Amino acid sequence: MKAPVRVAVTGAAGQIGYSLLFRIAAGEMLGKDQPVTLQLLEIPQAQEALQGTVMELEDCAFPLVDGIIATDSAEEAFRDADYVLLVGAKPRGPGMERKDLLEANAAIFSAQGQALNAVAKRDVKVLAVGNPANTNALITQRNAPDLDPRNFTAMTRLDHNRALAQLSNKVGCHSTEIRGLAVWGNHSATQYPDISHCTIQGRPAADQVEHAWVKDTFIPTVQQRGAAIIKARGASSAASAASAAIDHMRDWALGTPEGEWTSMAVPSDGSYGIEAGLIYSFPVTCRGGDYKIVSGLSVDDFSRARMDQTAAELAEERDAVAHLLP
């Protein structure tokens, strides 16, 4: 059996946390041969609820769980962490402007970045799940100057999985028969789910669906799926978000399947004309615990306009919190 690794989860008593922790504990994220120590962070007023989740985790008697820490201290939760899932974030309240939401979360993620900088493993892998995820990842990264900027990512795997589901439903195939889908940009309504390099059962997707459907139905449906789930369920997507977080971390840690890519929001290196430093979703491959942006894809005018629109939104978000960045 391997030595245990430390997995920190913030917002651990919340809905996504509840859907996430039992699957991590069962080995679905890092493998059935990888023991884990769970380091769970919650705000003081949620500590009792967190204890309830810890009791349930204990009652599962998971063979892979080496230990559980529950705390309201970021330093304690992040100490020597190998993997960190930043799930906890301030939700948007009634009448709250996006700028207010950005500022409220900037305070949370600045403090968490500083704690990671102080106590986490130097090769820690960090995933921002809580929204606005891309900008929260950027704020965390900027507050952890001693860590590699590439260690900080944001989740667009939920958008990627949503796009797979819409496309497979449309053509009547299984999602595993789709290759080459990409989600570009921000985890927001400006994201661009792109099928232009996509194949379904080995044939170009563009030959199997009409462009009008892609433009008028597919893209808006994926962009608005989160809102549609809130309307239907009366609560935001939790289980699907947790599942996507596991997918993201599993691929980053263990690698993407040979010949396939996925979508991750990572620091731009200037690829595809996207401003360097923005946390932007690209198609990536993962190998040996590292990710690489897929290079050399052609970009037509339709894609370019959408890729630039979502980049502009990310630049606006960054500028809105610039006074709070180190």
Swiss-Prot record:
Q: Which residues bind NAD(+)?
A: G11, A12, A13, G14, Q15, I16, G17, N105, Q112, V129, G130, N131
Which reactions does this protein catalyse?
A: (S)-malate + NAD(+) = oxaloacetate + NADH + H(+)
GO biological process: what's one of them?
malate metabolic process
Where does the chain bind substrate? R92, R98, N131, R162
Which Pfam families does this chain map to?
Answer: Ldh_1_C, Ldh_1_N
Q: Name one GO molecular function term.
A: L-malate dehydrogenase (NAD+) activity
Using the UniProt record, name the top-level EC class of this enzyme in a single word.
Answer: oxidoreductase
Keyword vocabulary terms for this entry = NAD, Oxidoreductase, Tricarboxylic acid cycle
> What InterPro entries would the database entry show?
L-lactate/malate_DH, Lactate/malate_DH_C, Lactate/malate_DH_N, Lactate_DH/Glyco_Ohase_4_C, Malate_DH_AS, Malate_DH_type2, NAD(P)-bd_dom_sf
Question: What EC number(s) would the UniProt record show?
Answer: 1.1.1.37
Active site residues of this protein: H187 (proton acceptor)
Q: Does the keyword tRNA processing apply?
A: no
Q: State the protein's purpose.
A: Catalyzes the reversible oxidation of malate to oxaloacetate.
Concerning its family, UniProt says: Belongs to the LDH/MDH superfamily. MDH type 2 family.
**What name does this protein carry?**
Malate dehydrogenase
